[in-house]
Amino acid sequence: MATIFDILKTLNNNNNNINNNKIESCKRQYTVNKRIDIIPSMDVTMTNDKLIIETELPGVSKNDIDINIKDSILIIQGEKKNNIIKLQQQQQQQSEKSSQSTNNKDDDEPSIEEYEDDTKLKSNLNKNTENKDENKTTSSITNKKFISERSFGNFKRYLNLSEILYQLDLNSINTQFENGLLTITINKKSDNFQIKLKSI
């Protein structure tokens, strides 16, 4: 025969499972299929007339930040890109474009039959391929990492506003991004809009 403690323990375990399932479903609802690599630091201050949210995002471009309010949750998300990798990709694209343009130039050059001496052409081609090989080896040498301590990738931060949302004027949201600090300011509603309860 089960004691009252066994019954209470079973009920408690069932409630915990239900609550955990609700939390997981909420997380899944707000999580995009991107991996979150960085959780930025945040300060939230409430003054008499506004709510101030400051988030540290050093090294992040202004264009890579997305701010949303959904179901009374403020979501700050984006991507901190590695500038070296971005630079390498741009250089690679430029080199591909230049190689394509040199291939087009080769089409404009006279054919081998029009050259008086075939040996000059072969020596020029050999020099060009040697120069390209030298450029590849020097670029691979310059990309060695000695120390790598900075973080890059996707970031996301949530702020639950459900307890104070009724006090805020969402039409007055103001954002600033300067020196790696994102500042979101939301004004409070004026006193005229506050709900006052009458005593009975």
Swiss-Prot record:
Residues 86-139 are annotated as: Disordered. Residues 106-117 have a biased composition (Acidic residues). PROSITE patterns: SHSP. Residues 33-200 form the sHSP domain. Residues 88-101 have a biased composition (Low complexity). It comes from the Eukaryota. Signal peptide: none annotated. Pfam families: HSP20. Keywords: Stress response. Belongs to the small heat shock protein (HSP20) family. This is Small heat shock protein hspG2. The lineage of its organism: Eukaryota, Amoebozoa, Evosea, Eumycetozoa, Dictyostelia.
